[in-house]
Each structure stands twice: as structure tokens, then as C-alpha cells.
Amino acid sequence: MKFVIKHEIRGRIRVQILQGRMSIEQADILQYYFNAKPYSISVKVRERLSEIVIHYDGDRETVVRDLQ
């Protein structure tokens, strides 16, 4: 998946998915996928902006690897 990290601080990352507009089904799949990860504290998906905000506890590289 192609993406751009828009903003990050320790424990939170905001990512924009590089596509047109995200469907509700795609947003649900992404939210379920990242909520199932052990490092995930909370996940918000904004389908109109094609953005994901992930609050995590753990290694940043693991989150970025799962985004790819």
C-alpha cells in the first residue's frame, strides 16, 4: 500500500493512503486489521480523507512495516 506519513509523535502516527477516495468497506477492513494487531491501542479511519490514525504501544518500525 502506498502511503505518506503526515504526522507522528511517540505512540501515534497519522498516515494518508495515496488513492482517490476510500470506500466504507476499505475503511472497515483497515480498521479491523489494525485493531487486531497486538501493539494497537486505538485506530481511527477517515474514509473521506483516506487517513488512518493509529495509537500504538511498541515499535514504530513494526507499524510502518504493517502499513506496507
Indicate residue ranges for each PLM-predicted region:
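Charge-rich, low-aromatic oligomerization/scaffolding segments with amphipathic character
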Residues: 58-68
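Short, surface-exposed ligand-recognition loops at beta-strand->loop->(often short) alpha-helix junctions
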Residues: 16-26
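Short acidic amphipathic segments
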Residues: 2, 12-15, 30-57
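Long, highly charged amphipathic alpha-helices
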Residues: 25, 29, 33, 65-66
